Structures are given as structure tokens and as C-alpha cells.
Amino acid sequence: MAVKVVMPKLGMAMKQGEVSIWNKKVGDPVEKGESIASIQSEKIEMEIEAPEKGTLIDIKVKEGEEVPPGTAICYIGDANESVQEEAGAPVAEDNMPQAVQPVKQENKPAASKKDRMKISPVARKIAEKAGLDLKQLKGTGPGGRIVKDDVTKALAEQKKDQAKPVSEQKAQEIPVTGMRKVIAARMQESLANSAQLTITMKADITKLATLQKQLSPTAEERYGTKLTITHFVSRAAVLALQAHPVLNSFYQNERIITHPHVHLGMAVALENGLVVPVIRHAEKLSLIELAQSISENAKKAREGRAGSEELQGSTFSITNLGAFGVEHFTPILNPPETGILGIGASYDTPVYQGEEIVRSTILPLSLTFDHRACDGAPAAAFLKAMKTYLEEPAALIL
């Protein structure tokens, strides 16, 4: 009897999965565990393996088509076998095939250069079909991995070189796929379905900056982690959320759901998009433990090692544009969260202290919140609590 292969559920929040490319065609023999297709959903590209040995006798979902988890995408059976569709209940999650985690390239002693190259299966197949030299491609994915966008851009450049003079060239149309498609949908959904408001505040972190410089070398020596201002701000946010739980909530189905634990989402920028790894039960972590988790999660995200479960489930998020010189901005909520904190670029400025003018380091903070769940006064009180922690930082290390 033919075996049905379905779109796997990569995470609790997954609603649709896209078949990026088929590695096999109808009539091809397959081995158990062999990759038959690549799928992408929720910012992650993965492969689907054949659950049994046999022949690919039918493909139900075309390349580029999106379907819900549990939908049959193909059938594997005997070469002359016909497919008998099963009617009734959807496939249970326990019976769904397991998707392979993002491909990790291993340095095997006898491997060829082709095998050692960091490239996604989709990108490799498109490049080889088009006759592109893989060695000439520059990867922009995590860890320098060559992704689909790199190949499509290289093909576009190749066509451009063979096209009309520069003065006659037209604007380039870039299809919105993969991670960018997910980000676009979620950001539009966030703004359309919530009442977002951003308030700002400045904290004098002169004492904190001095403390950070004193503690960071010791932390690196003992624990292998440098302490940054972001780590202190994150710790302050966790403490402030415990005192102001309305910011650690969801607005869903006309109900406000407050969470007993702080699952902190820390936005990480990638070459081709943005992901938000989650630090669970952040309220149970010390400053150094929180710093280690933030650093490790960011590293895994940039190297493409973060799984789908590590990229969802946050109750409050933090994003930092300070490295780009941005001071205040309006972060967009990560639905269904009620709040997101934006960290700006610190700067030195003269400040009055009594009758004296002193040099102080100022850190701009921007808080976006959902006005359906939280009013302006509680949001301002949360920022005020953060300001207090940052200006008197002893509590952050206790």
C-alpha cells in the first residue's frame, strides 16, 4: 500500500508550509531516509526524508505552493501502484514525518570541496540546473551559507551582463519568498490587528557604564562571556516585567493573558532577514546566566542552528539598533505580545547635577505597547522602573 507523506508541523505557530523544490520526480526510486523535497516555513528551510523505500508515484503539491501541516504532498509505493486517497480525519501530529534540521556542513576527512560547501539544497539544485559555478557564489545566509536568494541574484546579474546598455535597463523585480515573505506577513498582521503606541524615555547610565567596564573582563575570564550594556538592559527588563506583568501578556480573543514566567525574545539581524530567539524562564537567570543565554542564542541564530521551537513562544521582546547610531525608533510588536523594547545608541552629554554641570552617558529607550491591553500610565511606569534599575544598577547583579 502506498505511503502518504505529509507537510510536517515545524512548530506550534505554523499555519502554512511551502514546498521549495522537489529533489525527486514522479517515477524516481527513493531510499528510506533519502531527501525527497525541501520545505520552508517560519523562517526555516528544511528537508523532508522518504519514510520508506520505494518509488515516488505521485506528487500532490507543486513547487512554490503553500499548504497547511498534515496535507499530503506526495505518495511513495510500488512502481506500478496507484494512489488511493484516504478520506476522513487529518493526519495526527505524531504520524507526521520528521523534517531534517537546517543542514549542517561537516568537515569530513575525505569530503570533496563540493561536499564541504555551505549551500542549501534548493540553492544547489537551482545553481546546477542553470550551470552556475558554485565557487563563484558568495553566501549571505547564516555562517556564509549560500541560500536561494544568492543564486537568483547571481542569475539576475548574469542576465544583466548579457542585456542592453545600462541606460536602457529596467527596474528589477525580486520575488518575495522564504524568510522575507514570513516577515512581511507578520509585520503587516501586527500593525493591522493591534493598537500600537510607542513612548520613549532616557536613562542616565553613567554608573552602569562604569560597572560594565569593571565587570566585563572578570566575566569573560571566569565564564567566557563579555558583559555588554544590552545584557544589563535585558536584566532590567526582566525585573521590571515582574513588577508590571501587564507588559508580559498577550491580547487574544478579547482576553488579556498574563504570563507567570518571562520568556524573553531577543531580535537578531541576519543577512537576509530577522529572527527572534527566545530565552525561556529569564526571571530565573542571574545576570551572567542571562548574558550567556543571549550570546549563545544569537550565535546559533547567525549560524543557522536555531530550531523552530527556539524561535517562538516569547512573551516580551527586545530589539537593539544602537549599533547603527539610532536613538529612538518605533519597534513593531511581535504578535500576540503586548510589549517590545527598543534600545538606542548611548551618547555623552552635559547634565546639571545641582549647580554643577557634569558629563553623563545617556541611553534612549523606546517602548511599543498594545493599547488594547495596556494604557499609557502602566507602560510609562514600566519604563520608569527600567530607568531606576539602569541608573542604580546594583540590583541588577544581586
UniProtKB/Swiss-Prot annotation:
Matching PROSITE patterns: BIOTINYL_LIPOYL, PSBD
Enzyme type, top EC level: transferase
Superkingdom in the source lineage: Bacteria
The keyword Lyase appears for this protein: no
Details of cofactor binding: Binds 1 lipoyl cofactor covalently.
Gene Ontology molecular function: dihydrolipoyllysine-residue acetyltransferase activity
Alphabetical UniProt keywords: Acetoin catabolism, Acyltransferase, Lipoyl, Transferase
Residues of the Lipoyl-binding domain: 2-77
Name assigned to this protein: Dihydrolipoyllysine-residue acetyltransferase component of acetoin cleaving system
Residue numbers of N6-lipoyllysine PTMs: K43
Catalyzed reactions: N(6)-[(R)-dihydrolipoyl]-L-lysyl-[protein] + acetyl-CoA = N(6)-[(R)-S(8)-acetyldihydrolipoyl]-L-lysyl-[protein] + CoA
Protein family membership: Belongs to the 2-oxoacid dehydrogenase family.
Residue stretches making up the Peripheral subunit-binding (PSBD) domain: 118-155
EC number: 2.3.1.12
Pathway involvement of the protein, from the record: Ketone degradation; acetoin degradation
Active site: H371, D375
The UniProt record lists the keyword Acyltransferase: yes
Pfam families assigned: 2-oxoacid_dh, Biotin_lipoyl, E3_binding
Native organism: Bacillus subtilis (strain 168)
Residues in coiled coil: none
CC cofactor: (R)-lipoate
GO biological process: acetoin catabolic process
